[in-house]
Amino acid sequence: DVYKRQGAYISNGTILMPSYVNIGAYVDEGTMIDTWATVGSCAQIGKNVHLSGGVGIGGVLEPLQAAPVIIEDDAFVGSRCIVVEGVRVEKEAVLGANVVLTGSTKIIDVTGTKPEEFKGVIPPRSVVIPGSYTKTFPAGDFNVPCALIIGKRKESTNKKTSLNDALRTHNVAV
């Protein structure tokens, strides 16, 4: 309770390392919130989610937002990721370290023969890494950050995230 602001809901079975969960946030069972992660006001975190060290999940109060960030069940959010402005990370998606997602961040699926663009939603089971694309400005061409969907979650991805499951199953605190 030291790291939880009054008015936040944290379900039984949640592992909360030194981190912060703000007012109105909802964190469902079996979730791990690792060291120095922040869950913003009214953010919704599903079951068995892993928020790695230093993750920032935005809230709706500062700056004022109409929709909360939603991280659906069984998602994995890698170290130092930032997810803000009402972005939705759907079920079993994996965000690699340092992915930054805002409401206006281009999310580009590069798994097909032609890129497919999204904004505001990471589709289920997507594996996402930081990327960039070239954009022309009056002063020239510059690389702009984006998020790249490079595949779908596979058994090998599950093995990389399975330590969390083992710790939960055997009720081991880290």
Q: How should each PLM-predicted stretch be described?
A:
Residues 34-43, 51-57:
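Glycine- and Gly-Pro-enriched alpha-helical subdomains that act as flexible
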Residues 30:
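Glycine-rich and polybasic anion-binding loops at the starts of cofactor/ligand-binding domains
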Residues 7-10, 38-45, 71:
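Cysteine-centered iron-sulfur cluster-binding motifs in ferredoxin-type domains/subunits
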Residues 22-26, 42, 46-47:
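Glycine-rich phosphate/diphosphate-binding loop of Rossmann-like nucleotide-binding domains
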Residues 2-3:
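Short, small-residue-biased leader/transition segments that mark boundaries at the very start
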Residues 47, 51-174:
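Glycine-rich hexapeptide-repeat left-handed beta-helix
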